[in-house]
Amino acid sequence: MTKLIYLIGPSGAGKDSLLRAIRQLSLPHLLVAHRYITRPAEIQGENHIALTPEEFAIRQQLGIFALNWQAHQCHYGIGIEIDYWLQRGSDVIVNGSRAYLTQARERYGNTLFPICLTVSESALRQRLRARGRESEQQIAMRLQRAEEEQNRLQSDCVLLNNDGDLQHTLSTFQSLLPLDRACTAHRE
């Protein structure tokens, strides 16, 4: 059975870095989906398709998104192509939203495999400051939200710590594959 790996975690936890590393592995059975976001693309940021709010609204009205949500004054969407990929037998990984996990679960049921990328508060603060996107007040708000969301995670979310070396996190992620045999057995 194919799986939709729903990667979640606070901003700055390293989701984009992990997705880039997974993409570089070129695993034949795992496709990395991109997101559509109403913010400009960044050189070091997430590999996404930048849309204006108007473009996003048109695509949303046309039903082009399998999943979509709003956070941090932006709209986010995952294209319906992921449904085709799953139907064709590929596992798919998406950069999801912690707040939208319940809706994703409703749409995908047992196909959904949520992984929460965790990181210590000190590492998260350091990463948020280093990327330079947020003010100190925004960083404080993101740290508070990260703690609140961590406390609300569903028990079926696999926790994947990313405090250390990205290669270690990538190896731990790979140990979860093949997903049909490992998806409920691993919790770090």
Swiss-Prot record:
State the UniProt keywords alphabetically: ATP-binding, Nucleotide-binding, Transferase
Gene Ontology BP, a term? organic phosphonate metabolic process
The entry's cellular-component GO terms read: cytosol
Q: Name one GO molecular function term.
A: ATP binding
Q: InterPro entries from the entry?
A: GK/Ca_channel_bsu (IPR008145), Guanylate_kin-like_dom (IPR008144), P-loop_NTPase (IPR027417), PhnN (IPR012699)
Q: Which Pfam families match?
A: Guanylate_kin
Enzyme class, spelled out: transferase
Q: In which pathway does it act?
A: Metabolic intermediate biosynthesis; 5-phospho-alpha-D-ribose 1-diphosphate biosynthesis; 5-phospho-alpha-D-ribose 1-diphosphate from D-ribose 5-phosphate (route II): step 3/3
Which reactions fall under this protein's catalytic activity? alpha-D-ribose 1,5-bisphosphate + ATP = 5-phospho-alpha-D-ribose 1-diphosphate + ADP
Supply the EC number(s).
2.7.4.23
The UniProt record gives the binding positions of ATP as G9, P10, S11, G12, A13, G14, K15, D16
The UniProt entry's sequence similarity note says: Belongs to the ribose 1,5-bisphosphokinase family.
Q: Check the record and name the NCBIfam families matching this protein.
A: phosphon_PhnN, PRK10078.1
Q: What does the UniProt function comment say about this protein? A: Catalyzes the phosphorylation of ribose 1,5-bisphosphate to 5-phospho-D-ribosyl alpha-1-diphosphate (PRPP).
Q: What is this protein called?
A: Ribose 1,5-bisphosphate phosphokinase PhnN
Could you tell me which species this protein originates from?
Answer: Pectobacterium parmentieri (strain WPP163) (Pectobacterium wasabiae (strain WPP163))
